Structures are given as C-alpha cells and as structure tokens.
Amino acid sequence: MNPRVAILAAMAVSFAFAQPPNATDHWVTTWGASPQARLAAPPRPANAQAPTAPAAPAPPVQVTSFNNQTLRLIVHTTIGGRRLRVHLSNDFGLAPLKIGAAHVALRSKGSAVVEGSDRALSFNGQPSCTIPAGAQMISDPLDLELPPAANVAVSVYVPGETGPATYHGTGLHTSYISKAGDFTAAPEIAEATTTQSWFLLSGIDVVAPADAAAIMAFGDSITDGATSTPDTDRSWPSLLAQRLLANPATAHIAVVNEGISGNRVLRDGQGVSALARFDRDVLGQSGVKWLVIMESINDIGQSLRATAAPSDAITVGDLTAVIHQMIERARAHGIKVFGATLTPYEGAAYYSEKGEEVRAAYNQWVRTSGEFDAVFDFDAATRDTSNPKTFRAEYNLRDHLHPNDAGYKAMADSIDLSLFGPQPAGRATGSAAR
C-alpha cells in the first residue's frame, strides 16, 4: 500500500474511534479520581515551635510499585452508557510506563467479574501501550452496556517494574493486586492482596445523550470521603449522585469526585496544589457543566496551627484570590461554579482560634461575595447550633475534622437538586444558600 494512503487510513480509523456514534451523543465522565504521588513531608522550619504533643504514628507504608502483576481496580460509576473509554495515568511516574494488557468488565463480587461482560481495551488499535512519564493515555472506545451506578472492574497488567506508581490514596473501594502474571482476562484473581487505593487509573467516560453532563466535586479529604465506611459509597459526592439518579429529572447527571485527602489550595500537600491540578482534574474532564469547590481547610489548619512558623501564616484574601482564579477558568469553559462553605473543625489536631477566624471569614465570603452561581452551605448543614465551631454530635467523628457517614449524608441532602434541572411537584430537594 502507498505509505501516504496507509497513514490516511490509520488517521481515519483513529478519528472514527474518537467519535460518539450519534451526532447528539457526547462523552461524559462518569467516574474519576485525581492522580497523586506520595510526597515526602516538608522539613519543619528551624524557627517553628516544638509540638506540644507527640506526633501521631506514621501510617503503614503501602506498596506503590509493581512488576509483572495485574491490578484489578474496582470503581463505582454514576451515569450509564452503551460505550466507554478508560483513562490510565502515569502523571507522576518517573519513567515511561508499559501497559501489557488492560480489560474492563462489570464486577460481580470480590475480584470476580460478571460472566460475558469482560472486554479487552485497546490503544490506537493495539492491545498494549507505553505511557510517557507525566502523561495519561485514553483507551479506544468500546461497546459495553454500562448501567447507572455500576461496579466496574478495570484490570491492568504491567509486565515490568513500574517504579513509584501514580495512584489515588483514598479509594475507599477494595481493589486487588495479583501475584506474578497477566490475569486481566481472568474471571477472578485468586490469592490476590487487597488495597483501598487506586493505581494507574484516573477516569472512565461514557457516551451519553446530549442532555447528559457532569458535576465535578473538587476538594480535599472531606470531598474525597475520608473516614466514610469503605465499600459503601458514602462520601457526599457519592450520596449526591444517588439522589440525582433516583430523580428522573436529574438521572442523566454524573458526579465525579476529584477530591484529594490532605490537598491544599496555596501549596502542595497530598497531591499538587488545587490550582496546579485544576486544569487536569476539572477542565480536562468530559461533559463538565457544573463545578463544586470545597477546599481551604488544610491551608487554614496547617498554616495557622500553634506549631506553624510565622512565615506560614495566611489570610482569607490569600485563599479567595486562588478560588477566584478557579472560578474564572471554569467560567471561560462555560462551567457554572458552586461554592461550598467549610465544615467545622474545633477539636481537630490542627485547630486554632486564629484558624477559626479565617474559616468564618472564608465562609462569609462564600455566602455573600456573589462570586458563585449558588452556595452549598455545608457548614450550616453540619454545625452544632449551640457551638457552631464544631459538628453536631450525631455527625462528629473521632478526629473532629471529618464528618461520619450521617454527616456526609446531611451534606448531600442539603443540596438543592433544582440547580441541576426541574423537579417533580412535591419533591424535597434540599437548599442552597446565597
């Protein structure tokens, strides 16, 4: 074949792979997780005060590299579709990442998949690919009838040493790591070890009708769902997704959780700073129509705690300037932006009265500045009326920073669903303060 003809034919195939089947259909992200790398803790400034209490013991070191192994990663999607594509991430890899094979299937239970649902993924028509360091790779679209709120198994085989693998720490779903070998097509992975993190996987898109769209939930651990019950989907974004799916007027709307536990706005924490990852984790997703921003409490807590160096101090203006940048970027892409107030934190390890003053001022800005298209008042939904600095007793977890399952439900239930579409008469939808 003429070389030029061959190139044009390959381009035509690639273009065909990229297009939804109908002109009115489009790609919408139904599930996502923000990629991150394990970062070393920054050194303590020489002029910082000594801590008044011993530091908490370090968590166990988690395996973060793989060699000749299969990862079966279990995720819970939101809206369904008849075609899908998968995003794999080597964002924080130190070298090119070889993917030997990858499959997607509906999960049955444990590491087992539903018979007949397994599909091999391809990348530009090939069963394997190499992802450059710092990059992502999107699979070719494939046909798979994906119901709403599906448990999906994405299996990825890495034939060689990965080095430190890009991951998302707070997965809150049990996933499986094989012994040596390619088990991507296996109905079940026997003798697998388990993890509550997701490795190498950052998103799933579906082909959906023209009116389908996604809400991006952008934040820190309180958005990530930290301390909620694992394998039950009880983060506030998951619970919001359940409310939307249960309502015929909003069942076409996906909710994508792009929170990172320990994330910060002004500087890197767990994961790069919120502003640094904003384009990738919000603007780079498919079918985004709405954005919820709930982030700043880690900046307040870490920078204003008693042991922080004076040079670390921040003001509410520092925070709002960065949030304003996110709002402007989102609006330039036609995305509506909802601001969420910060939930109480008195009693948390990094609580301070100065920090509480900044939290209150930040919440007042969210409520009254007019910067947002609407406000989700999570503070009002969860605070103790007799002591607004802390959670209501029934929502309070042991660390006084994260709500329990009931608290996350209160947050999700406080959201006015009419912001996303007309509601059936008589249906309670929650509220949105302005």
PLM feature segments, named:
Residues 228, 260-317:
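Oxyanion-hole/transition-state-stabilizing segment in secreted/luminal serine hydrolases
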Residues 92, 160-161, 221-225, 260-265, ...:
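Solvent-exposed loop/turn segments at secondary-structure junctions
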Residues 225-238:
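Glycine- and acidic-residue-enriched helix-capping/strand-helix junction motifs
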Residues 17-218, 228-231, 249, 420-434:
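N-terminal secretory targeting modules
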Residues 85, 214-219, 223, 253-259, ...:
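Structural recognition of the beta-strand scaffold that forms the well-ordered cores
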Residues 275, 301-303, 342-434:
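Catalytic His-Asp segment of secreted/periplasmic serine-dependent ester chemistry enzymes
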Residues 1-7:
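Bacterial N-terminal signal peptides that target proteins for export
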